């Protein structure tokens, strides 16, 4: 019982003693106030009649995202001049820091620091007689009226210092059992110290002298003699995770950066050992644009070795949805910015809060000069716990990368560590002990990394963190010894340790987050714009190179770069996943509209320049943006036609254009030379017979292309989540309004209009004269909420795994639920296609903008719409236009050509009529060609340094390839480069041809000069 009394005694003592550290406190009134909009620049407003007196009972705010200025000429009492003072600001709203009222404090005209629920003090060290105080206030995501309270405080420095020296060891005992020796020992020393403190008259000479005596006792007996540094270290680095957008817009993110970074800089002045790390080049660019002066201060702290610039990427991007080339550009743009602005070569991919990690990443990282990967989000998996926290992660091509999972969490006495961890830790005994307890690789490493500080506008580390560090760095028994160190140097040390230790484990394949599966589908329009923009800008680059090489046309470097920056920005892990507020998507949509207009202009300018210079007798000019010779459908004068043998990354003037079809269509069946489809009364497939392969595609007794609506009310994180019980309640979308036949050039089909509640689903199903695929064009006016809409194809395929398209390759995933790990993958991410094949036959389901798949028990499902209502109450209640294609085939997806068909769906042939004309260019041209079926050229662009052309290839079938790459232009030299375009070695060439050997799923980048 006495031990319990000890804990209670210390708790109430510290509460009382903390009050007695205050030497002076006075409420400050008489502020002037002026509502405003978002400020532009750092010019302070003129204090004129537009400012009104803010009286004692006044309130401010009253709406979301309200802004205001507060001003006060502060007169410091004479007895306080020369002392260290603090001006404390509060709003009486103490909720979550990310959405609370926040301020930027300007002292004597200079932006000094941010203020928020965690950082309430404006530091006035060596106080002057008077100050001009401006506070730029932001109400947060609150529509309530807010208080505004300011006090001027002074403290007894020795008492405040002693407070922390007592509080830290006291907190250590809270995470040990009362019968442990360390608990008993600390109790004796701490009680001995507090018994020396005379609190009869706080502030008296007796009080202050007793404080000095107690501090000397602790320093001598406890910290000096008893405490020994533990063998376990907690490497600590200040951090503030700032979401580029989420529950706020990009405009507010700019302010969050100003507040957070200025607060860090201000605390650095007070705590010389304080080190801080921040990622995301985009945030630094925001800072540079908003406050060049503050940006210069950050650069100086980087130079002095106190501020760590790391992270590699432009933003902390979603790694499920971003394309392979986008991930390359994330790192290329991010690392280039850090190198050019700070002289830093970033070596760490820092993604603490991203919703899963593609198995293509290890190779992308390694070939970008990034050799370490850090996250913590994987600890949020709701079913299984990753067995490792320090390991080598092996990707689809066999490349491995050193990986470290952060493990900070609260320690709970008497309980085993929880699964969830945090990247917004507190530098206190609770989380240092909890972080090491949670860490699983103690047999190879005795250190953990703690990133401490409030995120998302919470302002980063607080004074308490840094005061605790001053105590914990001494080495307090019962808690890991705190050590301030950059993340990069810590990770490099642990990596070397792991490389030497044979016990270091390896994880092969994707790091699948068993959570947030709805992010593959939510906010479908945003995902569609991302997919369109990715292909548009790659094609615009390639065509610009074509026009440059053929005609000497200037390459639009700046416009292309700006467009890519916007694409990368919108791949932030709360924008593209669909988990932000409505206003974020309104801004994002405008940004996409702008860059799509610019990208189309660049592409069209290049195509037009080429077209105007072709020497031809006339016909149809067809451009093929893909890296393989293509025959397929395209639009000509609004009609679907079929063209043959269009050269890769090139064009051809053709005269043989097919524009008719022999497809048979009724309301009961569709038939061409490839398939015979029987329809039931709802328009679903009751049979799909593959005439070429003489087999039924659908499982006996089952129906294909059945649209099903599932109740989607996840247990939390509405727009993020799909909970596994969603299948318990569903409704078939079978209310048919009409079925009518369609004919369009080389294709024919039916249009089915269905109703579901208040929504209208129009689906056009097409069969083709020359291509063995079935297209489903969808035009949906969606009005529902909390519904998950899927299409399903139950196939007659026997396979225990399915193949999914990802960045620069594919992954296989189980179709069964044998283990909890298998069952947890009830919804997975893929890019352009997924395939289910048995030996000799299979079915691919392609798409032009969808990402969520579900293939189990031979049923292929594609998720079409998810419409939660938090944080966006109107999410996906809009028009949806998209296409998916069913491709039954002989062989597997490799033999069938699924990869090429998927590229053609997303990057189709383009045709236009061309009249007879004279010109300098031939009627047929290929910028490059590859003599291998399993190698794709993803990118052709000018080099970032302007010196040459970059060509990026990858092997797409998990097979080795010896290929000849033939270019359509002259070049003197060819170099193998990394993904950052650094030359690694010179290659031999034979005329315009380069011979290459690619390993399975290997990415190869060349520079031609």
Locate the predicted segments by residue.
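Histidine-centered catalytic/metal-binding microenvironments
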Residues: 1-40, 151-248, 533-646, 940
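N-terminal catalytic cores of secreted or lumenal carbohydrate-active enzymes
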Residues: 2-14, 18-21, 75-78, 88-321, ...
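C-terminal (or distal) subdomains of carbohydrate-active enzymes
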Residues: 361-366, 374, 380, 389, ...
């Amino acid at each position: 019982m006495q031990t319990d009394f000890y804990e209670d005694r210390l708790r109430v003592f510290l509460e009382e003693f903390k009050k007695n550290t205050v030497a002076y406190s006075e409420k400050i009134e008489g502020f002037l106030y002026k509502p405003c909009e978002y400020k532009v620049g750092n010019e302070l407003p003129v204090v004129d009649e537009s400012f009104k007196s803010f009286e004692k009972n006044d309130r401010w705010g009253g709406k979301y995202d309200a802004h205001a200025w507060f001003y006060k000429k502060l007169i410091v009492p004479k007895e306080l001049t020369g002392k260290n003072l603090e001006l404390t600001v509060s709003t009486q709203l103490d909720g979550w820091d990310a959405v609370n009222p926040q301020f930027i404090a300007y002292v004597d005209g200079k932006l000094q620091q941010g203020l928020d629920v965690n950082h309430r003090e404006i530091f006035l060290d060596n106080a002057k007689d008077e100050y001009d105080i401006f506070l730029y206030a932001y109400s947060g995501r609150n529509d309530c009226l807010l208080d505004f309270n300011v006090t001027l405080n002074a403290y007894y420095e020795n008492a405040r210092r002693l407070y922390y020296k007592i509080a830290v060891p006291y907190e250590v005992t809270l995470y040990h059992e009362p019968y442990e020796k360390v608990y008993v020992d600390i109790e004796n020393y701490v009680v001995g110290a507090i018994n020396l403190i005379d609190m009869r008259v706080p502030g008296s000479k007796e009080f202050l002298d007793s404080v000095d005596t107690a501090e000397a006792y602790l320093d001598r007996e406890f910290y000096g003699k008893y405490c020994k540094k533990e063998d376990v270290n907690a490497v600590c680095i200040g951090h503030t995770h700032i979401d580029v957008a989420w529950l706020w817009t990009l405009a507010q993110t700019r302010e969050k950066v100003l507040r957070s970074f200025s607060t860090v800089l201000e605390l650095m002045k007070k705590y010389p050992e304080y080190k801080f790390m921040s990622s995301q080049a985009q945030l630094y660019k925001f800072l540079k644009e908003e406050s060049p002066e503050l940006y210069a201060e950050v650069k100086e702290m980087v130079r002095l070795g106190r501020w760590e610039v790391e992270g590699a990427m432009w933003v902390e991007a979603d790694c499920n949805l971003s394309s392979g080339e986008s991930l390359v550009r994330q790192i290329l743009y991010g690392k280039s910015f850090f190198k050019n602005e700070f002289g830093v070569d970033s070596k760490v991919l820092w993604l603490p809060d991203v919703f899963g990690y593609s198995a293509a990443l290890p190779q992308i990282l390694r070939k970008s000069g990034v050799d370490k990967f850090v996250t913590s989000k994987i600890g949020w998996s709701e079913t299984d716990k990753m067995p490792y926290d320090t390991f080598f992660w092996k990707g689809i091509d066999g490349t491995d990368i050193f990986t470290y999972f952060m493990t900070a969490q609260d320690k709970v006495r008497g309980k085993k560590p929880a699964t969830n961890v945090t990247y917004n830790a507190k530098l206190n005994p609770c989380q240092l002990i909890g972080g090491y307890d949670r860490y699983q690789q103690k047999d190879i490493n005795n250190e953990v990394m703690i990133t401490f500080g409030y995120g998302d506008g919470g302002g980063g580390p607080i004074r308490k963190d840094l005061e605790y560090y001053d105590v914990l760095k001494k080495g307090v028994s019962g808690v890991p010894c705190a050590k301030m160190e950059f993340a990069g140097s810590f990770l490099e040390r642990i990596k070397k340790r792991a490389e030497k230790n044979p016990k270091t484990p390896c994880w092969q394949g994707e790091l699948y987050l068993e959570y947030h599966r709805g992010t593959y589908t939510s906010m479908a329009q945003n995902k569609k714009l991302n997919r369109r923009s990715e292909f548009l800008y790659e094609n615009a680059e390639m065509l610009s190179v074509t026009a440059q090489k053929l005609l000497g046309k200037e390459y639009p470097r700046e416009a292309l770069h700006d467009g890519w920056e916007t694409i990368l920005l919108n791949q932030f892990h709360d924008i593209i996943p669909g988990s932000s507020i409505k206003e974020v998507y309104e801004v994002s949509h405008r940004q996409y509209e702008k860059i799509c207009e610019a990208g189309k202009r660049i592409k069209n300018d290049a195509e037009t320049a080429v077209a105007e210079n072709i020497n031809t007798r006339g016909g149809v000019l067809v451009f093929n943006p893909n890296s393989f010779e293509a025959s397929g459908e395209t639009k000509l004068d609004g009609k679907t036609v079929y063209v043959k043998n269009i050269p890769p990354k090139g064009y051809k003037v053709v005269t043989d254009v097919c524009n008719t079809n022999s497809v048979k269509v009724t309301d009961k069946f569709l038939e061409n030379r490839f398939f015979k489809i029987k329809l039931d009364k709802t328009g679903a497939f009751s049979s799909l017979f593959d005439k070429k392969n003489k087999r039924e595609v659908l499982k006996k007794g089952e129906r294909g292309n059945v649209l099903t609506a599932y109740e989607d009310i996840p247990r939390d994180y509405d727009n993020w989540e799909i909970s596994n019980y969603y299948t318990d309640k569903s409704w078939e979308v079978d209310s048919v309004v009409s079925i009518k036949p369609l004919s369009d050039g080389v294709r024919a089909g039916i249009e089915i209009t269905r109703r579901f509640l208040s929504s209208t689903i129009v689906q056009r199903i097409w069969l083709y004269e020359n291509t063995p695929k079935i297209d489903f064009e969808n035009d949906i006016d969606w009005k529902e909420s909390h519904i998950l809409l899927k299409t399903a194809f139950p196939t007659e395929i026997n396979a225990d795994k399915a193949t999914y398209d990802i960045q620069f390759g594919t992954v296989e995933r189980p179709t069964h639920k044998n283990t909890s790990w298998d069952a947890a993958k009830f919804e997975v991410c893929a890019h352009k296609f997924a395939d289910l094949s048995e030996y000799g036959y299979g079915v691919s389901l392609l798409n032009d903008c969808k990402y969520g798949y579900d293939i189990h028990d031979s049923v292929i499902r594609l998720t079409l719409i998810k419409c939660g209502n938090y944080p966006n109450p109107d999410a996906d209640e809009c028009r949806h236009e998209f296409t998916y294609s069913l491709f039954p085939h002989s062989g597997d997806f490799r033999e069938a050509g699924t990869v090429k068909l998927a590229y053609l769906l997303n990057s189709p042939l383009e045709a236009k009529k061309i009249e007879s004309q004279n010109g300098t260019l031939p009627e047929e041209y290929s910028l490059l060609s590859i003599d291998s079926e399993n190698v794709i050229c993803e990118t052709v662009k000018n080099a970032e340094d302007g010196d040459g052309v970059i060509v990026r290839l990858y092997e797409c079938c998990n097979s080795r390839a010896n290929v000849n790459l033939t270019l359509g232009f002259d070049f003197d030299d060819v170099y193998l480069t990394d993904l950052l375009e650094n030359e690694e070695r010179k290659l031999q060439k034979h005329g315009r041809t380069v011979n290459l050997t690619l390993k399975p799923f290997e990415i190869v980048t060349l520079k031609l000069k």
